[in-house]
Amino acid sequence: MLEIPHLYHLATASEWDADATEPYTVSTLGRSLEEEGFIHLSLARQVAGVAEAFYGDQDVVLLRIDPAKVTARVQFEDVPEAGDAFPHLYGPIPREAIVSATPVPRSADGTLDFTGLLPEPI
């Protein structure tokens, strides 16, 4: 049986509320699910590139999401600028689908450091 990989979402530290009980609805950098139409997600191999492109100067929290506990449709859509297809969630992220929420540290050069936070590439 094929194991479904976890999906990931980068939340700014100011947007993430670990104590909230409502589903998470921030799509990206302050834009809501309602404004954007979906929530931007990533596969593990895509996270660092997304962080570099959009979150370089932000303090971020890496949300690891169990796709089996997501109730809305996840659709992979091509992002030509990135040369890849990214998962988009067409609904909120249920809190029970969030496996972990980990603040991402910075390396000595100031970049976000995902060492040990993501699975190793196969």
Name each region found by the language model.
Residues 1-122:
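Conserved, structured core segments of small domains
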